[in-house]
Amino acid sequence: MARIVVGAVLAATAVLASPLAGADPGQIPDLSRYTAVDVHPYNTYYNYPTTNGAQFVTPGGYRCRITYTGRANPPMKQASCWGKLPGTSSNMVSVFAAMSLEPATFSTGDLTDMEKYTDYEEPRERTVDPADYKLLPAGSKLVYPNTGTCAVTEVSTVCVLGDHGFELSAKGSRVF
C-alpha cells in the first residue's frame, strides 16, 4: 500500500512540475490586455483581384500578414508570420479559414514567395516593398476587420482567427 501511495505522489509531482501541466494546448490566449492600433497604416497589402491585408514586422524582426478575401464564397481569411521564428525550426506559420477553420500549421518554405503579389494596375507579379511592413509595437494588437487579431510583446506574437491560431515565443511556439 505504501508503494502505491509513494508511486502516486511521484507521478503527481512529475505532472505538476511539467511546464505544460494543466495547460490546454487548444487554449486561446487572452488578447484583451493589448492596446489596439489603428489598422489603416498597416493596411498595405493588396493582391489582385480581391485580397486585402495588413502587414507588420514584430519586435522580434519577423514579418506577419493578416488578410481577407471578400469576393470568395465563402470569404477567405488568413494570418501568417515568416522569417526566423522563435521556438521552432520552421520558418513559416499560418492559420486559414474558408469553408472550415483548421488549426494553424508550421511549415518550411521559400520566404521570397511571401513577398510576391499581383498588382492591380498592371496585372503582373511584383515584390512587396520592405517599407510596407510597419513595426507593430510591443503590447499592441492589430484587429483586422472580418478576419482576426494579431498581438505582440517584445518576445512573442499571437494571431487568432476564430478558435484557431498560433503563438510564437522563445519559450515554445504552438498552434491551436
Regions inferred by a protein language model and the residue ranges of each:
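Lectin-like carbohydrate-binding module/patch detector with strong preference for beta-trefoil
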Residues: 70-86, 156-163
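Short, hydrophobic/aromatic-rich segments at coil-to-beta transitions
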Residues: 49-55, 137-141, 155-157
